[in-house]
Amino acid sequence: MSEADARPSNFIRQIIDKDLADGKHTSVHTRFPPEPNGYLHIGHAKSICLNFGIAQDYQGQCNLRFDDTNPEKEDIEYVESIKKDVNWLGFEWDGEVCYSSNYFDKLYEYAIELINKGLAYVDELSPEQIREYRGTLKEPGKPSPYRDRSVEENLALFEKMRAGEFEEGKACLRAKIDMGSSFMVMRDPVLYRVRFATHHQTGDKWCIYPMYDFTHCISDALEGITHSICTLEFMDNRRLYDWVLDNITIDCRPHQYEFSRLNLEYTVMSKRKLNQLVTEKLVNGWDDPRMPTVSGLRRRGFTPASIREFCKRIGVTKQENMIEFSSLESCIRDDLNENAPRAMAVLDPVKVVIENFEVGAVENLTLANHPNKPEMGEREVPFTREVWIEREDFREEANKKYKRLVLGKEVRLRGAYVIKAERVEKDAEGNITTIYCTYDPETLGKNPADGRKVKGVIHWVSADKALPAEIRLYDRLFTVPNPAAAEDFASTINTDSLVVINGFVEPSLASAEAEQGYQFERMGYFCADSKDSTADNLVFNRTVGLRDTWAKIENQ
């Protein structure tokens, strides 16, 4: 199979293949243009993987460009966060980071060109009047009384706008297109507005700022972008994208292509809704592991490879659809099953005392870090007279299907010996506090010599040597697949999306690095929390369970 055959196919790549074959372009140049007014989420990750992935596969270039035309809502903090997220996902932009603000002087010149051609005018209608004059989808707009000003008057007024002689909302520059157009975006859209705000890149040099639709297409052209890829909500904006480029003097002529944005079950992607979750403290910040932000997914234990694989699996189409959350979980589960070292942790402990094991003795057992990858090495796990096991792994009575520890019967401790439950001790409420067992010292790494069958295997940790740890059990943030459709999306929050418990982990996890994934055997995949876990206070986040526990709920 050739390299081209191995590439994922989609309609955008088919367009690129044809453009290259026809000689329309000799190379491919894409860009990822986020606005630095918030944190990236997994929907942005889809766009990152698409744009950077295309550049990689076609030996082309991909720019990282910040669409920084709205200084009031932007911050350098978001710039740095976005750069970190792109790098973390495994991508490098070509050359220096680009900013739309790099082109403010050039954009101003193009605005002057449109005015000189009679294609732009300074309007003094208020923002409310502009909305009123624009009309509706069923009714055409009506022209502003300022629409037919002379070129000379518009040039003078635009210069006054730049000089700060108009208050905010008192004047704007509009394109002169068609107030009767069936496309709202073509009804004399605003190109520049007055904003007295300090910009994180240009400081106080400007008090007029270009609008997205004017800036975006020109920035693409100035950077030599061949394929400008965005989501479907910008489909109508393509008409304005083309109109601007058709009416200014510029060499490069990029084209815009649209694909469906990511809609993921049991979460929300709207920046407004995500901001509401944070400001109302429904979650613990933008990097809360329940959030769909890249920083939240990273903190939860998702790997770059799992997110790239997810974006690959869902593909690129023009069809809007809702992606099952289990698809995302499947990607990280597959990744960690293949690559995560194993460890043992007991989340709901009950004590086991092995009465025929020497008091105070410690036997260091050697366990593989991965059952199928000997190259991942081994670790020492201490075995002692007292161990913790999961409370659910013991019953006083059970049927034959129960393959764990039962009173009077045997089970194997993972990587250790066969033990037999002899008796239990209970508290005043009847809760089991201690299980007294014996062990067969001849069963380390082998079956009982007399041929008796021991079918069950359970995990454990030494009661003396294990480390206490806070375990955060994260789950889906909402109880319904499409919370955005609810009248009050916040009312559908899953109150069990975070359950905090205290358990014990094996000593090898004392040095667990932040965000390093582990399979806690029989319990799921976990990672050390990057903000709260310390050597003296271990905190582990559940990334995903061993299996999809929501499937049964959804199929009921």
UniProtKB/Swiss-Prot annotation:
CDD domains: GlnRS_core. Its EC number is 6.1.1.18. GO terms for cellular component: cytosol. A motif ('HIGH' region) lies at residues 34-44. Keywords: Aminoacyl-tRNA synthetase, ATP-binding, Cytoplasm, Ligase, Nucleotide-binding, Protein biosynthesis. It is an enzyme of class 6 (ligase). GO terms for biological process: glutaminyl-tRNA aminoacylation; glutamyl-tRNA aminoacylation. A motif ('KMSKS' region) lies at residues 268-272. ATP binds at residues 35-37, 41-47, 231, 261-262, 269-271. It comes from the Bacteria. It catalyses: tRNA(Gln) + L-glutamine + ATP = L-glutaminyl-tRNA(Gln) + AMP + diphosphate. The keyword Hydrolase does not apply. It is found in: Cytoplasm. Pfam families: tRNA-synt_1c, tRNA-synt_1c_C, tRNA-synt_1c_C2. L-glutamine binds at residues 67, 212. GO terms for molecular function: ATP binding; glutamine-tRNA ligase activity. Belongs to the class-I aminoacyl-tRNA synthetase family. Monomer. This is Glutamine--tRNA ligase.
